[in-house]
């Protein structure tokens, strides 16, 4: 592809895939697909090293991601959480080998620390998204309201990113933060 026509000149993408039809190719686009709706997120700091946890839940519109279960089984996925200042709060990466089909059209990925992400197909046609990150090392407990909202990005193979922010209402204690929309 000539440089003048390349939708992502900094990264090789011979197919020029552009799922959302904007000017950026999927491998350069920070938000390729819609449909992710995260409604809750929580963080808990443990006094023990490498024992912090965080979790998130919400839905994913199957109409915007009809092949997501097959894509995840074939290529894995990554989840990232950033605060409103775009600093990383936590992330999980699952290789294809750690993901399997569950239920009727769903998928579950589990890593060596027993962290999981589950996309459960529901009768309404959407997916219930459940994330449980275990044995993590959070640099510090996020401060609320200063760090809220939190952006959750679910990335599937070929760099398809789905983003949503959560944190309209947050509460905190000395060791935990909980936010919801």
Predicted region positions:
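Extracellular calcium-associated, cysteine-rich motifs in secreted modular proteins
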Residues: 1-34
